[in-house]
Amino acid sequence: MSERNTFSHPEHTTVLLHEAVQGLALKEQGIYIDGTFGRGGHSRLILSRLSPNGRLIAVDRDPLAIVEAEKIQDPRFQIEHNSFSAIPEICAKYGLTGKVDGILLDLGVSSPQLDDAQRGFSFMKDGPLDMRMDTTKGLSASEWLAQVSERDLAWVLKTFGEERFAKRIAAAIVNYNKSAVEKNEEILNRTLQLAELISSAVPFKDKHKHPATRTFQAIRIFLNSELDELESVLQSALTVLAPQGRLSVISFHSLEDRMVKHFMRKQSRGEDIPKGLPLREEQIQRNRTLKTIGKAIQPSEREIAVNPRSRSAVLRIAEKL
């Protein structure tokens, strides 16, 4: 059985499993953080390569991921029910600030979340319109759509979904809910209900993409503050990581990848220094906090054939200086 199959969960094929873990340049006695436990594919592979003195802290805000993580009975492993933006606080709690040898982040929604209709992430399966990563906190998608203004909704769809028909779709959603309230009927509260409304609002269809794809993505990203969380954890990695500590990040859409790419590029170039200052090369280099490791990595044709959802994945790796 291949390593990829051994460590992936039956319900979830971990994307870029070997590549992301290899990017951490594991030390047998190192301290590592899996910021997105999911169903544990990356965590299990990391644990298999650590000595008895190694340590792995996993983080996830999905209650079902916590249930899965608690099945791992290993003294080197612990799970934290939290967002990965809380990694600095978690490290401070255990006295690990500046001592972590690697952080792995596998962004976006997992296959079990997509495949579970009750989570409300998929426009292909009928379920409650929820979309929260942590179902114990915040507004569901249905609750938020019932109170958001047309203008704000259009902004969310355009900003986080890059949806060209954002205004049309926002108007259709807000008008539907407004009419439902006036008629004392149910507001939008099912995934297929929303998907069908979006399809009817879009003037023409992209034959390669479902009309609801970008809208569902935008609402999910906004409700879960995904880009804010990502920006926070990227910045905190500079403090949490030890010198030569690695940051290995898998993203699944252009907004995430753009943010990761720009962050790593900026930190590897250092601060802009005005021309003409009498500085030596080593003084200029001090402003750099990271160095990028290799080029961006994408799944092989073989991996995409086995797991089509991996097609859009991009892995970027950097090392703290």
From Swiss-Prot:
It comes from the Bacteria. GO terms for molecular function: rRNA (cytosine-N4-)-methyltransferase activity. Keywords: Cytoplasm, Methyltransferase, rRNA processing, S-adenosyl-L-methionine, Transferase. Coiled coil: none annotated. GO terms for cellular component: cytoplasm. S-adenosyl-L-methionine binds at residues 40-42, 60, 84, 106, 113. It is an enzyme of class 2 (transferase). SUPFAM superfamilies: Putative methyltransferase TM0872, insert domain, S-adenosyl-L-methionine-dependent methyltransferases. It is found in: Cytoplasm. It catalyses: cytidine(1402) in 16S rRNA + S-adenosyl-L-methionine = N(4)-methylcytidine(1402) in 16S rRNA + S-adenosyl-L-homocysteine + H(+). Its EC number is 2.1.1.199. One of its GO terms (biological process) is rRNA base methylation. Its main location: cytoplasm. PANTHER family: 12S RRNA N4-METHYLCYTIDINE METHYLTRANSFERASE (PTHR11265:SF0), S-ADENOSYL-METHYLTRANSFERASE MRAW (PTHR11265). Belongs to the methyltransferase superfamily. RsmH family. Specifically methylates the N4 position of cytidine in position 1402 (C1402) of 16S rRNA. This is Ribosomal RNA small subunit methyltransferase H. It comes from Actinobacillus succinogenes (strain ATCC 55618 / DSM 22257 / CCUG 43843 / 130Z). The gene is rsmH.
